[in-house]
Amino acid sequence: MPGMIDGHAHVMINDDFGPVERDLDITDISYNAVIVSERFVRDGFSTVRDMGGPAFGLARAINLGRVVGPRLYPSGAFISQTSGHGDFRDRADAGFSINDAGDLSNFERMGIGNVVDGVPEALKATRLNLRNGATQIKIMGGGGGSSRFDPIDTTQFTEDEICAITGAAADWGTYVAAHTFTDRAVNRLLDCGVKTFEHGLFISEETMQRIAAEGGYMVPQMWGISPDLARNPLMPEDKIPLVEELGQQYADFGRNLLKNGVKVVFASDYVGKFADAERARRYEIGWRTQTFDSNFEVLKQLTSTAGEMIAMSGPRNPYQAGKLGVIEAGAYADLILVDGNPLEDITVIGGTDQWFDAPEEWEPIDTIDFVMLNGAVYVNELD
């Protein structure tokens, strides 16, 4: 089958938020990222869209053959407003006056995110990412669960700011992806031409229909509505009832996306220790077969549909010699051989119903016997 594609991962955010914000520097996360990249390939992933972080040097090292890793499509630093989902400053860092709120978070110092306000700053951050080699731009269009100062229901960035960012990206022939959860945020983003919507777990069917009609893609991490999420040892106890309620309320989210014709791409999107992210990725593969009721649909999300989305980067796409996510003449020779039929048994590509109960130590998937990336063999256990 084709090499798999993760449409939303964070290769460079490879520890819990606390250490990344307070204790680590760029050398720590870069070393971790080398391990993360090697394990992506061993798990059968040939391509990863990195959705926030300084992955440019890693991508160059992979392309030069110095590091084993998948093709990386880096977004560069994600772009957030003050008080947005990418504003990870501690409470005292931001202060109470706009004149003393200049301290950067460690996320900004390391190039994981940029906090901007107003059209000029939004344009500068976008253009800086493009200058550094971003294949697409990632913005924070609404609130989130992992950030401290922006409730998940909030709408972020003004229309002028968003349209400035999408315009700057379009001038470079590429597109904008947005973190978002709600109807109000998604519709504002659509008004400005945003093309991919990360998460979106709480949107209505009417908004789904608009995404489909305007050629957008939904890139959700479905573990966000899994009952197992409440068992996360890092989950604050006071949030568990809400997590359980939302999981039940939006249990049909995946089915509704398909019913309304939305193209869906696989996303692991777990930020934290990289061993935890790998467990979450394998769980996500297994869990999606329940939320979309089809192994075939999940395989498309992991391969051909993701390849179509990746190609929207147009002239910023560093890999234009062939298609990704398919096996056909002229496509990139990204192949994995699997001992079993994933249409019948998703576990043969690593899918599992275990998340926090899964072994903490990473082990290769013993049913993935062969991995080829661009014609080069990285795994061969056929002998």
Indicate residue ranges for each PLM-predicted region.
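Metal-associated gating/positioning segment near the N- to mid-region
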Residues: 1-64, 85-91, 160, 189-192
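Histidine/acidic-residue-rich, glycine-tolerant segments that coordinate divalent metal ions
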Residues: 63-188, 196
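Active-site gating loops and adjacent loop-to-helix segments of metal-dependent hydrolytic enzymes
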Residues: 12-30, 38-41, 87-110, 145-158, ...
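Active-site core of metal-dependent hydrolases
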Residues: 139-252, 263-273, 292, 316, ...
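Divalent metal-dependent hydrolysis catalytic cores, especially in the metallo-beta-lactamase
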Residues: 32-58, 69-78, 134-147, 175, ...
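Short, surface-exposed loop/helix-turn segments at secondary-structure junctions
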Residues: 234-243, 318-321, 346-360
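His/Asp/Glu-enriched, well-ordered alpha-helical/loop segment
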Residues: 171, 249-342, 347-349
